[in-house]
Amino acid sequence: ISLRQGLAFRILCTLAKNDNDLIVAQRLARYEDEEKADAVFVDAGYGTGIVSAGQGLGRDWTLVWFAGESADPGCLNKRAEMWKQARDWLKSGGAIPDDPMLRDELQAPETVPRVDGKIQIESKKDMKARGLPSPNRADSLIISFAFPVVKKSPLDALRVSSSRKEYDPYA
């Protein structure tokens, strides 16, 4: 779980693989509240249950399909689009923590040459064949570029807090 605001990025926590989507959703909701996040993006590759659990908590999180269509015609898919935006963000002064694992993961994927000139990022399967781990920390940065984020209004915060009140049949 990570946070990007403007030119600053930090990893809030790392979680071991967990099959309990509710626990992950509760932790994500806590960070959303503590950090006053304007948007939460969840990797659709394993996060559909997390988003469903979040809906039960009154949350409106966005699933991101890395293989989905890119809004940038120069990119093969959403994954390539997000990597390109992260690259541009870093070039413009984006700051990442002093984390050797994150640094290595950001440098690991290679671009795949294509006849049509579109940017394609090496697949995780191909990275694994080269002996590289899945770039989970890097993915937590690049997913923050999935869609434009609009600052929430104070009314949005009230809607979330009021939607999480428990029903009391005796009240």
Listing of model-derived features with the role each one plays in the protein:
Residues 7-119, 160-171:
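Mg2+-dependent endonuclease catalytic cores in nucleic-acid-processing enzymes, primarily RNase H-like
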Residues 1-6:
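Gly/Thr-rich phosphate-binding beta-strand-loop-beta motif of the actin/hexokinase/Hsp70
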